Amino acid sequence: MTLIVTGAAGFIGSNLVKALNERGEQRIIAVDNLTRADKFKNLVDCEIDDYLDKTEFVERFRRGDFGKVRAIFHEGACSDTMETDGRYMMDNNFRYSRDVLDVCLAQNIQFLYASSAATYGGSSRFVEEREVEQPLNVYGYSKFLFDQVIRRVLPTAKSQIAGFRYFNVYGPRETHKARMASVAFHNFNQFRAEGKVKLFGEYNGYAAGEQTRDFVSVEDVVKVNLFFFDNPDKSGIFNLGSGRAQPFNDIASTVVNTLRSLNNEPALSLADQVQRGLIEYIPFPDALRGKYQCFTQADQSKLRAAGYDAPFLSVQEGVDRYVRWLFGQV
């Protein structure tokens, strides 16, 4: 049977295609928008059966042009949280998703889709409950609104619907994301270019570099998606983060030490890295005051209750692997 991956040339989508290939799956229809042509590089080492532009996909999907489809991994979206064109965002992230969902429901096709931790916005709690969801931008709202649709249709759905609220994902195949790429990616490039990593200084009661995020490796994101793919009886909306809140200092320090290791230099403590000027703290920008989340951490209770029991990579493990991969691409 055929599998479909939307956003297939993007960050998470291409990692899913590669992982499916490694399981022997090659009847994969890749759907994307290659206006940003450099994304094609993410699929060069992948095997797909066909490629479609997103503009022609939904109608052909609705007509049944692809034969028997087992599942769709719906990763296609505009993920730029700085995008201010609300009509564009809602069309890409909400309306497009609704159209794909409607076909899956009508044809009893597994529907696994990308939500986002941006649905929580200004909340200090990160649990999959309507009361704590406070999106701060139109990107977060587009994901939030689609999640509300899912909550309404879940009780009567005859096929699987599984949504994943991705936290701060990092890992291979994100180069095309440019300014929206992960902190680890930018720290890597900054250290190679300048010999140091710059982090925000003290703010809102957090010491320099100690603002925290739930950083999750794309390896774990893929594993969770595949777990639900293998368990079509499990539906719902689930947080997909490591369950740990780790400071930006951990990312920067791991990037520095991994690059030092690759240069046959010994690891240094964070204090030594700062003392040597390898990590530098800059004043917190006025433009971000009052608009910046100093803490995120996925509540994994619902994910674990669904039966996913594998451990998640820590920043030290995952970023080390990622930096070594990036170094091999240089």
UniProtKB/Swiss-Prot annotation:
Which Pfam families does this one have? Epimerase
- Please state the pathway this protein functions in, per its UniProt record: Nucleotide-sugar biosynthesis; ADP-L-glycero-beta-D-manno-heptose biosynthesis; ADP-L-glycero-beta-D-manno-heptose from D-glycero-beta-D-manno-heptose 7-phosphate: step 4/4
Any keyword Secreted? no
Q: Which GO terms describe its biological process?
A: ADP-L-glycero-beta-D-manno-heptose biosynthetic process; carbohydrate metabolic process
Annotated membrane-spanning segments are none
Cofactor(s) needed, names only, are: NADP(+)
* Keywords recorded for this protein, A-Z: Carbohydrate metabolism, Isomerase, NADP
What residues does substrate bind to? N168, R179, H186, F200, G201, E202, Y203, R213, Y292
Note on cofactor: Binds 1 NADP(+) per subunit.
Per the Swiss-Prot or TrEMBL record, the active site comprises Y139, K177
Q: What does it catalyze?
A: ADP-D-glycero-beta-D-manno-heptose = ADP-L-glycero-beta-D-manno-heptose
Enzyme class, UniProt record, top EC level: isomerase
Family matches, as InterPro entries: Epimerase_deHydtase, Heptose_epim, NAD(P)-bd_dom_sf
The UniProt entry's sequence similarity note says: Belongs to the NAD(P)-dependent epimerase/dehydratase family. HldD subfamily.
Function per UniProt: Catalyzes the interconversion between ADP-D-glycero-beta-D-manno-heptose and ADP-L-glycero-beta-D-manno-heptose via an epimerization at carbon 6 of the heptose.
Regarding domains, what does the record say?
Contains a large N-terminal NADP-binding domain, and a smaller C-terminal substrate-binding domain.
UniProt name for this protein: ADP-L-glycero-D-manno-heptose-6-epimerase
Q: Which organism is it from?
A: Paraburkholderia phytofirmans (strain DSM 17436 / LMG 22146 / PsJN) (Burkholderia phytofirmans)
Its gene name is: hldD
